[in-house]
Amino acid sequence: MIKNRLINFFSKKEITAPIRNKMMMNWSNEKNFYNQRKTKEKLRLKEGRPHTVFYFHSLSDPYSHLTIQVIKKLISHFNIVLEIFFISQPSENFTPERKMYRKHCLKDSKEIAPFYGLKFEAEEFYLKENENLAYKILDYFSDMDQGDYIDLIFKVSSLLWDNDKAGLTSIISELSNDESELLNKKITDINIEGDKKIQSLEYYFSASFHYEGENYWGIDRLGYLEDRLIELGLKKNNSDKNIVKKLEKSKFDPSQIIEKDDPLILEFFPSLNSPYTYISFKRVKELIDRYPIKLLTKPVLPMLMRNMKIPTHKGKYILSDSAREGRKHGSIIKDIYSPIGSPANRAYSLFPIIDSYGSGFRYLEELTKASFFHGINIGNEEFLEELSNDLGLPWDKIRVKLDTDNWRSILEKNLKDMYSGNSWGVPSFKLTNFDNSNPYYQWGQDRIWLIENEIIDRLSSRR
């Protein structure tokens, strides 16, 4: 019974707010993070196990097509054992708005690939009929040398995304003496073992790595795995630290800004219950300080207040990963008080009037800091009064809007705008020219660098 309640504990009332907040703090706590590493390493030594990294791949995942291109580098640079598993795509509880998610993965993978020196050029998803043949090939040749098998996975994946059925068939002719045996072989579900394995490790996404208690998703988090392996002394040589480096664009020279130039418009879509939103504020502010940008802050309701579910495994990963990212970017997650429900509603009710004073961004920034660093109930009226005063605002005029409902239609309008850019989660971003033309959307704090790249491109084109 308890287990069933925990499946979607974020949205269940059976588990009280204090218990939920404590669990969230345990998952994001830095001391717990490093203690787990020490415990896992002691256990590994005691059991005499090698340094084993698990890699989870799905042919239908564009991000997996990126990660398979770096696997051989990982093996050649580190003294590790790599085990490869194929897995199914997670349920809709883990990936709400599935159609939007699939479209996003395709677009995002194609957009980031060149910056990592990788290839992915598919404009659309492959024909489903070719997937079974692809998995038959990978299942049939799974006993070959691992390096050759990794090459085969990449080749099969490339042909699949190119919808090249003839190319897939030619692989069989090249590698098998009995083509009919492979084609007629009744394939077992190649994903069964991988699905069980990844569930046992409390994770759900493909294109991911797992090493001794920690999950690392895709190219974006591979650096964390490398750092950990380096700390354990597993680097084989003194080659460059990162096996995959992101190409950085040169920063735009502020001296080139012409005073009469119209600023770009950046719309920022945050929510109050998102740790990823909290750790993004600092970098968004840096963009505003660095470039001629007009910022529009457009909050939306948290996913849980939009009747979406967050399974426990996902919640745990979100907290641990956002804390890890926060430490990297200088936005520490410490004490947590989740504002879901009444606290968020009360805080949102003041946003329209506070934003009319030009303080909407700072207000939401301080609210998320209160929730994810100070552990404060942001629905407390004394706190809201103190925050209003800190922002230099007249509390007597602000407080009359507390617990009113006019904010709901504003947030609903913001949500529709965010969805129009194929973004359903936060933080999301929309960059336009000053006349609102040429909208460019990005979802997630992971892609703030792409927003900056687009800003640089647009400003540079004016020179």
Question: Where in the sequence are the language-model features?
Answer:
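Structural alpha/beta surface segment adjacent to cysteine/selenocysteine redox centers
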Residues: 59, 65-160, 279-371, 462
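Short boundary motifs at domain starts and secondary-structure transition points
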Residues: 41-48, 253-261
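Soluble or luminal CAZymes and related metallo-dependent hydrolases
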Residues: 101-105, 186-190, 276, 314-318, ...
